[in-house]
Amino acid sequence: MDSYIALTLFGCFFVLVFIGVPISFSIGIATVASMLLMFPWDIAAITVSQRLANGLDNFALLAIPFFIFAGTLMNSGGIAIRLINLAQVMVGRVPGSLGHVNVLANMMFGSISGSAVAAAAAVGGTLNPIQTKEGYDPAFSTAVNVSSCITGLLIPPSNVLIVFSLTAGGVSVASLFMAGYLPGILMGLAVMIVCGIIAKRRGYPLSEKATFAQACKAFLDALPSLLLVFIVMGGILGGIFTAAEASAIAVVYTFILSVLIYREVKWRDLPKLILESVVTTSIVLLLIGFSVGMSWAMTNADIPYMISDALMGISDNPLVILLLINIVLLIVGIFMDMTPA
């Protein structure tokens, strides 16, 4: 019976994704379909509703809408262009300089906003036209932007790490944030190395060398934005506030920068930005809620034990098992976003 439930759950999910049904609804429908094999329809409906509500009944999830709103404010508040100017000063004379600027700006913006999507939109939207004008292949520019924006998923604060903390049974958010720095930086450096090799082969131009005065100006302009990282991470690691409280502080700080200091965001723009954040938050939280329900259905059908037995049948070496899990995540990540994966 368990094998039929597993086949129904995953088969229904992949068929729905393949025909274009949104992932959150694909997860929800597949979960309901599998539960109908375990319970009568009325109990299945009640159970799915309860699991969805229970999955969202967590104080730590408050961090997600706040960080999303902070990222939306940053995207429109002139923070991205200041980080781009700082990155250009840092790597302006390196082959493929605008590509390296893209990577560094994505790393800095992602570490501030906690969102890869916000970083890709803000940095790519600003740099791609400039790169095209300088003779960069648009496909190359897009590839660099997409490859580097995902560093924001690792370099704290990161919404994905918060979601993982909840789904993994309460792993410390502060520990996950600290663990995210090294792989995020290494990933960014790897993209920069490949970018430099390709740029040198294609003969992409260098940027003009910045004067000391220009470098100081770029640093001072970007400093208020960069301070947000130290405020958020320093507060979390120092035990001053939790991740949820830090996200609220990030919104207040970003609001002051974007609306009151830089004045790039007008008061009349706020309702639109709030609505954008609400839509994005709704999508993420719906994914989390349905994913919790799907996890419960899998556990109730002993699917995790089946997967565990299959993995242990291949090898009992922890490194091999981790490698297999990463291969599975790589394949699954082709079809769906990081949060439901």
Where are these regions (language model features)?
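Alpha-helical transmembrane segments of multi-pass membrane transport proteins
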Residues: M1-A341
